[in-house]
Amino acid sequence: MTTSTASAAPREALSHEAKRMRDEYHSADVVIVGAGIFGCAMAYALGNQGRSVILLEKSMKQPDRIVGELLQPGGVEALEKLGMRDCLEEIDAIKVFGYDVIYYGEEVKISYPQVAGDSSIREKAKGIEKGRPEGRSFHHGRFIQRLRQKVLSNPNVSVVEATATDLVRCEWTDQILGVEAIRQGEPDAYFGGLTIIADGYNSKFRKAFRTDAPISKSKFWALELIDADLPMPNHGHVLLSDSAPILLYQIGTHETRALIDIPENLPSASLAAGGVKNHLTNVVVPKLPARVRPAFTAAIARDRLRSMPNSFLPATTNKTPGLILLGDALNMRHPLTGGGMTVAFNDAVLLSELFDPAVIPALDDHAAVLSAMRTFHWRRKNLTAVINILAQALYALFAAEDAQLRALQQGCFEYFKLGGNCIDGPVGLLGGIIRQPFVLFYHFFAVALLSIWLYIVRGKTVLLPVRALGSVGVFFKACQVLFPYIFAELRS
């Protein structure tokens, strides 16, 4: 007992000294910009390692966003590893068991796969507990506030409400020493051996370190439905038709989020046609299940329409001494599959392992940190490449714009109808349960081959030779959908 008390005293003294350095000199082991999904997770993980952390956030008010409201099972598992799973409590979170895909009115239930001790899924499901995994859906703002409360409880983390405005650089080495900020209207500065930029999809610092920019070809427009009568409660709903996809999922006991994808320059959503409300009323409502229409129509009349760009940005290797970009500032994919938070939490888990004090005692050891970031860049791809590629490929199919893509869309739905591994594999990938890129490759081309077969045999007999020839175009379209995103992952 004496030994334990004696060893605890120096640690407590170090903790007090570190806090004094943060409070008086604004100096820490790590400065993190952005107390969002990734920033909170990373701050808490590093604080638990005994690192001294300053977390900057421009506003600690509860955010009001329309994305970041569905956490896949792989994200729930990562939250557990971070010791933050209790953040899903007391926010009226809804259990999510899978998806209900509705294709021109026909439904297929897609449940997350059972992870049994002796199953093939178990072999592919790295780190997922035995049993049937569950996701969670919730109000984004409530979840963020719970994450922030968790971080505030960590004695090694100081949360500061301030707006980061610029980076502090060493004049001789050009390495990053910290950030300049505005706090309570006054200029200030915060210094760390490592600066982590996690300021979200619209990062003000990203363009200083990357020449490329996020690619966005559509927006999600959002409504909040009250007491909607969903076809399959506790499931995400994906509605497919001759227009872009529609998502429906509960975010509370009484609230359901509706996300409507509207591509750029869509005629029915143009100002001349009456704008987005015209598109929602005259194009979207008729495509909804009849039981959902009353709540949807009421939301159109009641809600202020809000939107978010659907962006794609492949990750790049961090090479700047003293600074790393992470979260949406580093990597984004289409939010159709709800994979963003799962990627963020798993990145925090992996990075905390690579930054373990037993491996990197001091985070101002820039050579060691950059070496760890090279490892991080490639190790994360078992999960992130799968989620990134799947999100982009599924969006291309679900928002089919030509005959070949519509053939692939139909083939995808028929593939789901086969059940068994034809459901377990794809939804296991989407849920962050299966983390093997080859499994994605296998299922995608299984869908492509089924699509080609259906394209040939479901036409008129007299057109069989023509459709057989046209099937080549379907195959090449499948390659055109998938391979650019594979190359983007490899190139980055």
Question: Which functions belong to the PLM regions below?
Answer:
Residues 34-39, 200, 327, 340:
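Conserved phosphate-binding and hydrolysis motifs of nucleotide-dependent enzymes
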Residues 22-27, 77, 85-88, 94-208, ...:
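Conserved N-terminal helical subregion
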